[in-house]
Regions:
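Conserved "HGTGT" condensation-loop signature of ketosynthase/thiolase-family condensing enzymes
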Residues: 1-169
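Short beta->alpha junction loops/turns
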Residues: 121, 176-177
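Short loop-beta-helix segment that forms the pyridoxal 5′-phosphate
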Residues: 169-175
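Short conserved active-site loop signatures built around small residues
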Residues: 180
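Active-site histidine-anchored catalytic micro-motif
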Residues: 183
Length: 187
């Protein structure tokens, strides 16, 4: 069987990140070079309450300038995973040096040829947990109407696509730890 050669080249034009060692790319990169670990002890009471065997985690650092990067409406209508996706996407867009704040206002970008390929392991789990608690404690009429769009794994790609006015596609890969690698192949 012949080996398949990749004929496509990938060009990374901008970087964006929200990681346990930094809320943006410069901080993440500087801390990675210093060997900083993002692993910390989880001190919340629920660790003991549920007798969890794991008490450490790689918690995300506070995104740099978070209040400048999200409006109050965006913060309210997006699950934390969607908030982080949008913050990282905006940083990548800015890092790419495009002339406008989205695909419609940037001269060098065609919105009809601009898409989003997003990888996630689970999507809006915090929204799902909050909705479950609200349903149990207060009843179905108190569950937020935005619950479904906020918890769907493809909600993050949709939020980024709508915000950047990328009209070509909004694709989501959900394949555990390989999600982002597979999303890059789509992009």
């Amino acid at each position: 069987q012949e080996s398949v050669k990749m004929s496509r080249k990938v060009l990374v034009t901008g970087l964006g990140a929200t990681t346990p060692i930094g809320g943006d790319v410069p901080t993440t990169w500087a801390n990675a070079l210093k060997g900083v670990s993002g692993i910390t002890k989880i001190d919340e009471p629920w660790v003991e309450e549920y007798s969890l065997p794991v008490y450490i985690a790689g918690r995300l650092a506070e995104p740099a300038h978070e209040s400048e990067r999200l409006t109050k409406v965006e913060a309210k209508r997006l699950d934390p995973s969607g908030q982080l996706a949008l913050i990282a996407a905006r940083e990548a867009w800015e890092d790419a040096g495009f002339s406008g704040s989205d695909a419609e206002s940037a001269e060098e970008v065609d919105p009809l040829r601009t898409g989003v390929a997003f990888g996630t392991g689970i999507g809006g789990v915090w929204t799902l947990l909050d909705a479950w608690d609200t349903l149990r404690e207060k009843g179905p009429r108190r569950v937020l109407p935005m619950t479904v769009p906020m918890l769907m794994p493809n909600g993050n790609a949709a939020a980024v696509s709508m915000n950047l006015k990328a009209r070509a596609a909004a694709q989501t890969v959900v394949s555990a730890c390989a999600s982002s690698t597979e999303a890059m192949e789509l992009g």
